[in-house]
């Protein structure tokens, strides 16, 4: 499939909403990093800082009824799926009011009413499940699709290719989105896979794919909209590789010494928030005062999330024995 450049362009309203969404994700993740350092968040914590344009664009082109599933770097995905940030932060802080009742933590966020199916701690494990979600949509005769996110490290997992094969064989409406942030934990793409154009990983199954600049919201929007259109119309999978970058380590416990400060700064020069902000101002979609007002509202949302979470109770001990399956 060939992506047509600039076939679709975000509207003024979509630009403004996405700027607010991306800023909220950035400030939320920054606060999570701060709270983790203070010992308020335990366990693993994988931040999405730097990658905000990817999920924001996908969320903008999603239709009501579409589902989302991803890996353990999932805070941003569940928030844009419709979960209030305060319930996400409460979960990270292990509170009973969290979206997973304080039992899932950072890596296992769920919101079934908003069709967000995790949050999965096993690398690549969400891909067969996302394929199954797409099967359910086809079986039930809907026109919904499933956006299944995975990282560059997950593309080397065997179960991913089993899922690709099944999706192609049965013609399932799933968009596989590879968030290629260059490093699988500390291992670069160049050191982990021979085929570095990850969007070509499905070619042997007849699955088309293409690559996008994940730091550019407008390019992401155009590509994601065409990808969703293709999958919805053809009831057939497609692979979307987005080149992006995480500014922080793999997790909060990772000092990221496998890459240079110069490399990180080079990517920060193309910060997705800076790009979308400049586009909005250049096109006179909003003024500096308008954007500052948005920034203040985002600050209040994060502040309220912290207050809500701190004042929420810990789960009752009896919760240890609920929702346990074997």
From Swiss-Prot:
Database matches in Gene3D superfamilies: 3.40.50.970
Molecular function GO terms recorded: pyruvate dehydrogenase (acetyl-transferring) activity
EC numbers on record: 1.2.4.1
CDD domains listed in its UniProt record: TPP_E1_PDC_ADC_BCADC
Reaction equations catalysed: N(6)-[(R)-lipoyl]-L-lysyl-[protein] + pyruvate + H(+) = N(6)-[(R)-S(8)-acetyldihydrolipoyl]-L-lysyl-[protein] + CO2
Pfam short name (any one): E1_dh
Biological process terms in GO annotation: pyruvate decarboxylation to acetyl-CoA
Needed cofactors: thiamine diphosphate
GO cellular component term of the entry, any: intracellular membrane-bounded organelle
InterPro entries reported for this sequence: DH_E1, PDH_E1_Alpha_Subunit, Pyrv_DH_E1_asu_subgrp-y, THDP-binding
Keywords noted in UniProt: Oxidoreductase, Pyruvate, Thiamine pyrophosphate
UniProt superkingdom: Bacteria
Physiological role: The pyruvate dehydrogenase complex catalyzes the overall conversion of pyruvate to acetyl-CoA and CO(2). It contains multiple copies of three enzymatic components: pyruvate dehydrogenase (E1), dihydrolipoamide acetyltransferase (E2) and lipoamide dehydrogenase (E3).
Subunit structure, interactors included: Heterodimer of an alpha and a beta chain.
Protein name, per record: Pyruvate dehydrogenase E1 component subunit alpha
Organism in which the protein naturally occurs: Rickettsia felis (strain ATCC VR-1525 / URRWXCal2)
């Amino acid at each position: 499939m060939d992506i047509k450049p600039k076939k679709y362009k975000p509207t003024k309203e979509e630009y403004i909403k996405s700027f607010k969404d991306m800023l909220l994700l950035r400030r939320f993740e920054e606060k999570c990093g701060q709270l983790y350092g203070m010992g308020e968040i335990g366990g693993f914590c994988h931040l999405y800082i730097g990658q905000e344009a990817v999920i924001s664009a996908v969320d903008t082109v999603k239709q009501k009824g579409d589902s989302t599933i991803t890996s353990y770097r999932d805070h941003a995905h569940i928030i844009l799926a419709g979960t209030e940030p305060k319930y996400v932060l409460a979960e990270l802080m292990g509170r009973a009011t969290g979206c997973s009742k304080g039992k899932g933590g950072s890596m296992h966020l769920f919101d079934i009413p908003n069709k967000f199916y995790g949050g999965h701690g096993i690398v690549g494990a969400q891909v067969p499940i996302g394929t199954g979600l797409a099967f359910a949509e086809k079986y039930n005769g809907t026109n919904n699709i499933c956006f299944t996110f995975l990282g560059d490290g997950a593309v080397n997992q065997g179960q991913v290719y089993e899922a690709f094969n099944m999706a192609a064989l049965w013609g399932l409406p799933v968009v596989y989105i590879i968030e290629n942030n260059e490093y699988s934990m500390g291992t670069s793409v160049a050191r982990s896979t021979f085929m570095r154009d990850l969007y070509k990983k499905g070619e042997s199954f007849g699955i088309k794919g293409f690559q996008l600049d994940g730091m550019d919201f407008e390019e992401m929007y155009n590509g994601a909209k065409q990808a969703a259109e293709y999958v919805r119309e053809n009831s057939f999978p497609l692979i979307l590789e987005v080149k992006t970058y995480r500014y922080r380590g793999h997790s909060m416990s990772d000092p990221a010494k496998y890459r240079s400060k110069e490399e990180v700064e080079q990517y920060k020069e193309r910060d997705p928030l800076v790009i979308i902000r400049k586009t909005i101002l250049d096109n006179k979609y909003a003024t500096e005062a308008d954007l500052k007002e948005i920034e203040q509202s985002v600050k209040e949302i994060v502040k309220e999330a912290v207050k809500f979470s701190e004042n929420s109770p810990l789960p009752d001990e009896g919760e240890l024995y609920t929702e346990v399956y074997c």
